[in-house]
């Protein structure tokens, strides 16, 4: 299939979120690696108000990915416009409105690309959070594909919500604090309403989900970061639904570790510490690029870790300033936030860090368990490296991911399935405190070999890890799906 020069140009527009960007870049690398006729230009929307280490890591990722067939263009960022939007729109509308302000930037750059006459743009590949850019694709007369960076289960729920009548989904929002369970497509077991995506709980947000479903139906295809062996029921529901565009399971799409030192000096120090720990002895706690906790919750986690007696590596981030929509940052003095003497007492068995090079850590043989927020990238990374998870979901589709991992697939143990916290805002008035006892119980289930539940989950994770690797090599389900996707790209020229 490979040829010597690119003949088909794709325009990729990823969301400014770190998790979305990482998987989108990896997807592009797979495509150009499979077919040299493809060339991809990324139009990068800069994340406003972000001066964190996460941003620096993003820059490093893009530099490392640069090659002849991949080009990265940073669209101009107007912080004043972003600040004005922040004052006008609530959190759940801000990002969408901010992305809309970049339509002219995208329009201008694509016009510049085609004006040379040497570039034939065949399609836009748009992140699920950037669907307003489909309007620009229409202006240039090219089709849009969407990269759905979450999973097939979440995609199925989006389409299912759209199929409900207004009375039905209003009834659904009113059930959210109850113990009701629902029969839903793509699931074997009844699903507690508390395990549904947090967007389904908000009457103001539900119309946005329905609008997304309608928009997705207008695409030429939907790429989903999953593989058939992991989500067979959800994939079947989507593929057999004649009202849904072609769905391409292309995962797991993750950024694999090639060089232990690629993350810098801090990562090197962390890896040296892990090198001195016994095999599968360390529980790793990390809650994503925007996950953070205040002092009360930190003390509960610290107490649980100390009481469990297990070795640990704990990523601790400081929440944004009150009322601010910011990325979490580093604590200046952890001693002030943690129980008195905690760091000294646990010095021999634990290490507390700030920002964490998550994939590098999960790949280390000393890591035996992962306390996670259940973001989908984190879930796929843990499965790839065969590290079992204790679930602590916070927002978006994370509660659904946790339910799927614990109850549907039996690949994880639970700490909490219905924890709710808006992790982008610091107002903690409605935050549920997870107790030290709950956390300790989850860690013990995860790490102790005599625990039958944990033992079973570890074996199932090992088996799924092997399946994830088979899916992406020649003859695997996702490998074949990517081949069909490339064929479809070629038909657009």
Enumerate the predicted regions with their spans.
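Glycosyltransferase specificity loop/lid
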Residues: 1-493
């Amino acid at each position: 299939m490979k040829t010597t020069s690119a003949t088909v140009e794709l325009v990729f527009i990823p969301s400014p979120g770190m998790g979305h960007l990482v998987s989108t870049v990896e997807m592009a690398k797979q495509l150009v690696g499979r077919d040299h006729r493809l060339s991809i230009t990324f139009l990068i929307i800069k994340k406003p108000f972000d001066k964190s280490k996460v941003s620096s890591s993003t820059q490093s990722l893009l530099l490392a990915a640069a090659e002849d067939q991949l080009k990265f263009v940073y669209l101009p960022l107007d912080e004043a416009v972003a600040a004005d939007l922040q004052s006008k729109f609530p959190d759940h509308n801000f990002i969408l409105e901010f992305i809309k302000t970049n339509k002219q930037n995208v329009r201008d750059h694509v016009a510049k690309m085609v004006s040379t006459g040497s570039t034939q743009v065949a399609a836009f590949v748009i992140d699920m959070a950037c669907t307003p850019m489909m309007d620009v694709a229409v202006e240039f007369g090219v089709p849009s594909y969407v990269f759905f960076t979450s999973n097939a289960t979440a995609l199925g729920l989006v389409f299912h919500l759209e199929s409900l009548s207004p009375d039905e989904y209003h009834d659904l929002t009113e059930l959210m604090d109850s113990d009701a369970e629902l029969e839903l497509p793509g699931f074997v077991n009844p699903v507690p309403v508390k395990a549904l995506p947090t967007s389904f709980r908000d009457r103001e947000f539900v119309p946005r989900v329905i609008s997304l479903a309608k928009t997705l139906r207008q695409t030429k295809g939907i790429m989903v970061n999953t593989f058939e062996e992991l989500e067979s029921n959800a994939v079947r529901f989507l593929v057999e639904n004649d009202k849904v565009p072609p769905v391409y399971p292309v995962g797991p799409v993750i950024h694999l570790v090639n060089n232990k030192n690629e993350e810098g000096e801090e990562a090197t120090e962390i890896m040296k510490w892990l090198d001195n720990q016994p095999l599968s002895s360390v529980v790793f706690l990390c809650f994503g690029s925007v996950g953070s906790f205040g002092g009360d919750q930190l003390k509960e986690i610290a107490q649980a870790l100390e009481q469990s007696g297990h070795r640990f590596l704990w990523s601790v981030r400081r929440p944004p300033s009150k009322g601010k929509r910011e990325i979490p940052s580093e604590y200046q003095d952890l001693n002030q936030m943690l129980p008195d003497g905690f760091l000294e007492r646990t010095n021999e068995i634990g290490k507390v860090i700030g920002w964490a090079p998550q994939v590098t850590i999960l790949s280390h043989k000393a890591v035996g368990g992962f306390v996670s927020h259940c973001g989908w990238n984190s879930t796929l990374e843990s499965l790839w490296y065969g590290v079992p998870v204790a679930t602590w979901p916070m927002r978006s589709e994370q509660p659904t991911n946790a339910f799927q991992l614990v109850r549907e697939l039996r690949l994880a143990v639970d700490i909490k399935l219905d924890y709710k916290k808006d992790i982008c805002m610091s107002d903690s008035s409605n935050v549920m405190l997870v107790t030290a006892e709950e956390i300790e119980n989850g860690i013990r289930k995860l790490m102790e070999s005599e625990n039958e539940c944990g033992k079973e989950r570890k074996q199932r994770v090992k088996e799924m890890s092997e399946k994830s690797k088979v899916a992406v090599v020649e003859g695997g389900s996702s490998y074949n799906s990517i081949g069909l996707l490339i064929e479809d790209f070629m038909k657009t020229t």
